[in-house]
Amino acid sequence: MSVPLILTILAGAATFIGAFLGVLGQKPSNRLLAFSLGFAAGIMLLISLMEMLPAALAAEGMSPVLGYGMFIFGLLGYFGLDRMLPHAHPQDLMQKSVQPLPKSIKRTAILLTLGISLHNFPEGIATFVTASSNLELGFGIALAVALHNIPEGLAVAGPVYAATGSKRTAILWAGISGLAEILGGVLAWLILGSMISPVVMAAIMAAVAGIMVALSVDELMPLAKEIDPNNNPSYGVLCGMSVMGFSLVLLQTVGIG
């Protein structure tokens, strides 16, 4: 099994961490969740804008028009799909109301699972493609995706457990969204692995960079602010950028990058 595929599987499996937290009742503080989402956004933004997009534009045979065009395509494609697909957001379920209605909250959790699954599928492809092109960047993207999958698993498992009383059912529903990400990585491994050219890989990387930027500014940062309105998510973003930037410099210094 390839290392990029293993990274994709591990990133998707992080959903189960949130699921177990949801059924065990040991919910992390809103401040910690918000910081982790901002941290993940910082990692994605730095890797996308400072590494992936420049690398795609510098690839042999890649024209600036195609490179920037694919980046914009990734941006607009994410926003378009996000607006077209009706789904609840994780913060809607993480905020516990007094005596929630079991049937209503279960239906909302199922809709959330569907929405997260559809949105996680391309994330799996993005993680695999990035790691295949540059393993160093793949580790960073896998870490960022894993951090943002934990509250997603928590957001689904907690309400389903409250509605059904079944830990197994709650973990199952939460795990489906993580499995969708793994499926995306497996399909990318099967379809793209042997027949992709350097130019096509660079074009996909540019589009993935656009998707990651859109995900960071449209989903992760606003979600962090909604989960913890009293703190600025920018601190998490800056920490994520700093840690990722330092790690990239360190890896390049020792000759890994």
From Swiss-Prot:
- Give GO MF terms, alphabetically: metal ion binding; zinc ion transmembrane transporter activity
The residues the record assigns to binding Zn(2+) are: E123, H148, E152
NCBIfam families in the cross-refs: PRK04201.1 (NF003243)
Matching entries from InterPro entries are given as: ZIP (IPR003689), Zn_transptr_ZupT (IPR023498)
Q: What is the organism field in this record? A: Escherichia coli O81 (strain ED1a)
Sequence positions that bind Fe(2+): N120, E123, N149, E152, E181
Q: Which residues form the signal peptide?
A: none
Could you list this entry's UniProt keywords, alphabetically sorted: Cell inner membrane, Cell membrane, Ion transport, Iron, Membrane, Metal-binding, Transmembrane, Transmembrane helix, Transport, Zinc, Zinc transport
Catalysis: reaction(s): Zn(2+)(in) = Zn(2+)(out)
In the bilayer, the protein is annotated as:
Multi-pass membrane protein
Q: What biological function has been recorded for the protein in this entry?
A: Mediates zinc uptake. May also transport other divalent cations.
Location of this chain's protein in the cell: Cell inner membrane
- Member of which family? Belongs to the ZIP transporter (TC 2.A.5) family. ZupT subfamily.
Protein name per its UniProtKB record: Zinc transporter ZupT
